């Protein structure tokens, strides 16, 4: 759902899932950085900004939404890590020599830091509920958090970038990364559905019965 925030996607999921039988759904939710950023006409008609004054509220809203989804749908909903494909135009260009506007480097650093933090919470929640982590963001960043921190200490230059081979025009995904993400999501959903709805084998049932009798 391009251009939709996590809150909007969560609302759609909540409205859609209950209309299906409780025993036959598995939902994978994925949202990008539009959950955090705002669209602005300053500098470029389609540029995005990450106002530092709203930073704490934005992150709190995201974490609240994620927690509510997990509490409501438990292991039947899998939340993908946020893939910030759009550190779009205004944040990341294909040419690292292009200087950032004044103050924007702080926004960029804050956005990346918060994305890493939110993704760590998503991974922990998925792990707590037995869901596999679909790490789409790892396929887009060219540096790890540790490398980013080290690079910043060595230099004040902008060091964050996306893997250019995955971006057609510096903004949009290539067909290659779309295919990878689609296969990853559908394969995970199929495997999880099989796991959720495969009845236990007779051997497992016998073992459980035997254990319960021993307890008595």
Where are these regions (language model features)?
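Histidine-centered active-site loop/cap adjacent to the catalytic His
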Residues: 152-216
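Structural beta-sheet core signal
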Residues: 29, 78-81
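Substrate-gating cap/lid alpha-helix
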Residues: 87-139, 166, 170-179
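Short catalytic/ligand-binding loop motif for oxyanion handling, primarily in non-cytosolic enzymes
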Residues: 35-39, 85-91, 141-145
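Acidic carboxylate-rich catalytic motifs and surrounding loops in phosphoryl-/glycosyl-chemistry enzymes
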Residues: 80-83, 128-152, 164, 170, ...
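A short helix->loop->beta-strand "cap" motif at the edges of active sites that frequently abuts
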Residues: 71-78
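Short, flexible, mixed-charge acidic loops at enzyme active sites
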Residues: 91-98, 148-160
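Conserved SGNH/GDSL esterase-like catalytic core that processes O-acyl groups on lipids
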Residues: 1-64
